[in-house]
């Protein structure tokens, strides 16, 4: 067998575009030094990356870095879907970042560069064909986030959140790398397909205690990335301490990366006899604990964080069924895989819409505030309140949020087809439990108990020349750092809402892509 690797630069085009975006952002910040130009370069780079992924993915599966039949980078339908999602979510987060960057507490060049660098890891992650490529891509996605979380000047909460996130992520990465090393020691393979074939051909490998330890370490390390219970404690603290756009990125792109990595190893590499029961148990714990703790939350972002934990449980459930269905029909396994991918797509779109609405309801650069501050918000900013309500109703799985409804139906159906009726019942019970806190927030938006604690609209710039010359009066809100200007956030919120409605009325679009 030849040890010379083949290289297909077309397969690498989306990754090239993402990495090139990061370089161009640095050059724009250095040479032009205008925030608008830097942000525009990052946004155009994200669009180019998405377009490149569609172009390459539409031409069939492409493999590169191959030695014999084993390839380290495989760009096909799933990789294209992941790359497009990562690029468009990055574009959406850039749209939400305008008020944060205008507030002046966060350097624009560094912020956009870190987002582009993280996007590069996400684009490469979906195409990873071996454990090392997968881990490196996942860390390329995650490493810039440590800095992004703590990049806001003068914020102790951001620094604490960054340290928490860093420590937990380093431990998770260490466990994953150790598990990969032990797997190599027991099997002599790192490529995902080769690992799966070895475990199928040589079942005696499963009797080696070191194999069980290795698989457990890899699974634990990756479940930390999706904030699965009991490895979830970092998520609420990190989300609440991070700037709102960064919290949105953590809740969407970072979560997507963890799910993609976990799905890759469960579907192709790790033995179902070990991973199936572990993932099913983690799914039950994650969705139950996430929903129960979310009921007690009084801060907006913490509620969304715990909701994200619960949603991770719904995603893990079909992954557990996928492994448990190893001895069942190929259709059952395919349904479980498609359900996990489809649910993740529905979730990240709705989550982006929810964070966009919260950004629209908060002062520039502020945190998410408390639920009490959302009371009566529909009277002042009805478009943002409607967007938040639709997103939360969708996450709850109720009409008109049909995306969330079909996501949960898809998960339950895949569990039933895979013979995991008990797990399907737990999902159904938790879906009902989640209604309580989602609908509580929706009701608060239209509450008349007290006016919403929301500053004045920043677009209402004083027209009095004297007022403009002397600046804002004492106790008033400076328009440059008050509520977000409606346009960029409204575009992101409207786009996310429209996408959620489209896939809600035509879920087969996502299911067909997920099944590729």
From Swiss-Prot:
<feature type="transmembrane region" description="Helical">
    <location>
        <begin position="131"/>
        <end position="151"/>
    </location>
</feature>
<comment type="subunit">
    <text>NDH-1 is composed of 14 different subunits. Subunits NuoA, H, J, K, L, M, N constitute the membrane sector of the complex.</text>
</comment>
<protein>
    <recommendedName>
        <fullName>NADH-quinone oxidoreductase subunit N</fullName>
        <ecNumber>7.1.1.-</ecNumber>
    </recommendedName>
</protein>
<feature type="transmembrane region" description="Helical">
    <location>
        <begin position="163"/>
        <end position="183"/>
    </location>
</feature>
<dbReference type="GO" id="GO:0050136">
    <property type="term" value="F:NADH:ubiquinone reductase (non-electrogenic) activity"/>
</dbReference>
<dbReference type="InterPro" id="IPR010096">
    <property type="entry name" value="NADH-Q_OxRdtase_suN/2"/>
</dbReference>
<dbReference type="Pfam" id="PF00361">
    <property type="entry name" value="Proton_antipo_M"/>
</dbReference>
<feature type="transmembrane region" description="Helical">
    <location>
        <begin position="108"/>
        <end position="128"/>
    </location>
</feature>
<keyword id="KW-0812">Transmembrane</keyword>
<keyword id="KW-0874">Quinone</keyword>
<feature type="transmembrane region" description="Helical">
    <location>
        <begin position="303"/>
        <end position="323"/>
    </location>
</feature>
<feature type="transmembrane region" description="Helical">
    <location>
        <begin position="81"/>
        <end position="101"/>
    </location>
</feature>
<keyword id="KW-1278">Translocase</keyword>
<comment type="function">
    <text>NDH-1 shuttles electrons from NADH, via FMN and iron-sulfur (Fe-S) centers, to quinones in the respiratory chain. The immediate electron acceptor for the enzyme in this species is believed to be a menaquinone. Couples the redox reaction to proton translocation (for every two electrons transferred, four hydrogen ions are translocated across the cytoplasmic membrane), and thus conserves the redox energy in a proton gradient.</text>
</comment>
<feature type="transmembrane region" description="Helical">
    <location>
        <begin position="341"/>
        <end position="361"/>
    </location>
</feature>
<dbReference type="GO" id="GO:0008137">
    <property type="term" value="F:NADH dehydrogenase (ubiquinone) activity"/>
</dbReference>
<feature type="transmembrane region" description="Helical">
    <location>
        <begin position="12"/>
        <end position="32"/>
    </location>
</feature>
<keyword id="KW-1003">Cell membrane</keyword>
<dbReference type="GO" id="GO:0042773">
    <property type="term" value="P:ATP synthesis coupled electron transport"/>
</dbReference>
<keyword id="KW-0813">Transport</keyword>
<keyword id="KW-0472">Membrane</keyword>
<feature type="transmembrane region" description="Helical">
    <location>
        <begin position="274"/>
        <end position="294"/>
    </location>
</feature>
<feature type="transmembrane region" description="Helical">
    <location>
        <begin position="213"/>
        <end position="233"/>
    </location>
</feature>
<feature type="transmembrane region" description="Helical">
    <location>
        <begin position="491"/>
        <end position="511"/>
    </location>
</feature>
<feature type="transmembrane region" description="Helical">
    <location>
        <begin position="37"/>
        <end position="57"/>
    </location>
</feature>
<dbReference type="GO" id="GO:0048038">
    <property type="term" value="F:quinone binding"/>
</dbReference>
<keyword id="KW-0520">NAD</keyword>
<comment type="similarity">
    <text>Belongs to the complex I subunit 2 family.</text>
</comment>
<feature type="transmembrane region" description="Helical">
    <location>
        <begin position="246"/>
        <end position="266"/>
    </location>
</feature>
<feature type="transmembrane region" description="Helical">
    <location>
        <begin position="386"/>
        <end position="406"/>
    </location>
</feature>
<dbReference type="GO" id="GO:0005886">
    <property type="term" value="C:plasma membrane"/>
</dbReference>
<keyword id="KW-1133">Transmembrane helix</keyword>
<dbReference type="InterPro" id="IPR001750">
    <property type="entry name" value="ND/Mrp_TM"/>
</dbReference>
<feature type="transmembrane region" description="Helical">
    <location>
        <begin position="419"/>
        <end position="439"/>
    </location>
</feature>
